[in-house]
Regions:
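Extended, charge-rich alpha-helical interface modules
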Residues: 1-81
């Protein structure tokens, strides 16, 4: 298995929110592009559901980060197997 460490470190609240939000926005745009390039209703619904899930998860994570009020440890690893 191959892996890529994208993020590893301690960040301020605003830095953590910025970096995580940026990554989630890239993933949302990926799903939006998939919607644009398909006419299959089932695929569109799956992409829309995933976008909503990402938005909800990001909102919850932002609340959690705000509640901590200190440096936040963030790790993001992509593993390909």
């Amino acid at each position: 298995m191959e892996s890529l460490s994208l993020i590893q470190g301690k960040f301020t609240e605003s830095e953590a929110v910025d970096i995580i939000s940026s990554m989630v926005e890239v993933k949302i745009k990926f799903h939006e592009n998939k919607i644009t390039n398909t006419s299959n209703e089932e695929d569109i619904k799956m992409q829309e559901a995933r976008i909503k899930e990402l938005q909800n998860d990001l909102a919850a994570l932002k609340k959690s980060i705000a509640a901590k009020g200190r440096k936040i440890e963030v790790k993001a690893v992509v593993t390909v197997g």
